């Protein structure tokens, strides 16, 4: 029985990539800087001491990062019995965003330029927002700027509740984000507004509209809920997910994967929120998955809760939780199963600002006859998609080289 399990540690980069200068990210290193902070006692909130990831280390994380940066991260070294194949991959795509990373690893790199709202204030064209408001029956909106999602709730959440005006904001990514209170504005109304916005954005080539629902009674206790929804463009070509689907296989999305691929190629969507629930759901789906199935999970908390919020201790604690549960996954794998752990970009919690960082991503692979050892530097995330195509004996993808 052949299956592939992809565990996407969203934003878990392993060092600045060769083209990082073009993004202002030279020196960024999500994994390395977390390990360094832990070793120096600077990440002892909710956890303490050096970063402890013994299972990821056995799969080759420390070695992959060493090959990426030229040095082992603090607390990681050669004194580990490797069980997995490891490498690090350069992104071909033009951006360092979520859709680009996901699409590329499924065999479809983004070789065009996304549209962006580059102005930090008055970010959105008036003709665009006028059309959105008219169609939605709204008389105004708040925000219209680049912002951190948590900060903008503190600044504008109470005014939003009083006025009923949605909060529009963006970032360095190709994204239009809309924050609304689940109770006072209504979740269905937010989703309808996002669907309208997605349609009106067609001429602008914006990658995603993101619904950002929140709850709470005031600025001191506003919090995002688990009902986020992404409205992505569809990939410009068939991904390996589509090809397996067309060949009669199954593709199970856990978390936000289905949204990122605009449901293309997805046969089942499983909703889960938080690291524990996402891991539980992934294990449950692997237990029930049959032959010719991909189970694909995005562990978004690493990015949304820890990377963007520059929470080093939280990121470290999340990684240690994830690592502690990996033996549960390994115990479910058959000899023909392929497990891949990777990331879609970096988001160094020690870096300036709140945006993603252009980094190499780890490629940790286990099973399917792979021998423990180095896969080297992969020229594209698409090597993952090509390897999956090879594993299932599908028609080769246009991009990528298989490491199987």
UniProtKB/Swiss-Prot annotation:
Mn(2+) 1 binds at residues 10, 344-345. It holds the Pfam family Metalloenzyme. Binds 2 manganese ions. InterPro entries: Alkaline_phosphatase_core_sf, DeoB, Metalloenzyme, Phosphopentomutase_DeoB_cap_sf. Keywords: Cytoplasm, Isomerase, Manganese, Metal-binding. It is found in: Cytoplasm. CDD domains: PPM. The keyword Manganese applies. Belongs to the phosphopentomutase family. This is Phosphopentomutase. It comes from Shewanella baltica (strain OS223). The gene is deoB.
């Amino acid at each position: 029985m052949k299956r592939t399990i992809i565990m996407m540690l969203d934003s878990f980069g392993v060092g600045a990539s060769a083209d990082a200068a073009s993004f202002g990210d030279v020196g960024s290193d999500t994994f390395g800087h977390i390990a360094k902070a832990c070793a120096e006692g600077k990440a002892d909130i909710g956890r303490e001491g050096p970063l402890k990831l013994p299972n990821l280390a056995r799969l080759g994380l420390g070695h992959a990062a060493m090959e990426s940066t030229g040095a082992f991260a603090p607390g990681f070294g050669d004194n580990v019995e490797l069980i997995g194949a490891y490498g690090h991959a350069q992104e071909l795509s033009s951006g360092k965003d979520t859709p680009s990373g996901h699409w590329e690893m499924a065999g479809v790199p983004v070789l065009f330029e996304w549209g962006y709202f580059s102005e930090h204030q008055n970010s959105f064209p008036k003709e665009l927002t006028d059309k959105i408001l008219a169609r939605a029956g709204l008389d105004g909106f708040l925000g219209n700027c680049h912002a951190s999602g948590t900060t903008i709730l503190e600044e504008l959440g109470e005014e939003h509740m009083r006025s009923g005006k949605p909060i529009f904001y963006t970032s360095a990514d190709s994204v239009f984000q809309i924050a609304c209170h689940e109770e006072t504005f209504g979740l269905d109304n937010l989703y309808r507004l996002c669907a309208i916005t997605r349609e009106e954005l067609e001429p602008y080539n914006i990658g995603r509209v993101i619904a950002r629902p929140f709850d709470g009674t005031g600025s001191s206790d506003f919090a995002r809920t688990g009902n986020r929804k992404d409205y992505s463009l569809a990939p410009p070509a068939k991904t390996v997910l589509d090809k397996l689907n067309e060949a009669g296989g199954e593709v199970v999305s856990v978390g936000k994967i289905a949204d990122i691929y605009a449901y293309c190629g997805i046969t089942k969507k499983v909703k889960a929120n938080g690291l524990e629930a996402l891991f539980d759901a992934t294990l449950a789906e692997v237990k029930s998955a049959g032959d010719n199935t991909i189970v694909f999970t995005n562990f978004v908390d690493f990015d949304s809760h820890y990377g963007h919020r520059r929470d080093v201790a939280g990121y470290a604690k999340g990684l240690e939780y994830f690592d502690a549960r990996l033996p549960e996954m390994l115990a479910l794998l058959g000899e023909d199963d392929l497990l891949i752990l990777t990331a879609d970009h970096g988001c160094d919690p020690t870096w300036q600002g709140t945006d993603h960082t252009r980094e190499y991503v780890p490629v940790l692979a286990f099973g399917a006859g792979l021998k423990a050892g180095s896969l080297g530097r992969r020229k594209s995330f698409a090597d993952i998609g090509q390897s999956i195509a090879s594993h299932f004996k599908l028609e080769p993808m246009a991009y990528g080289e298989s490491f199987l």
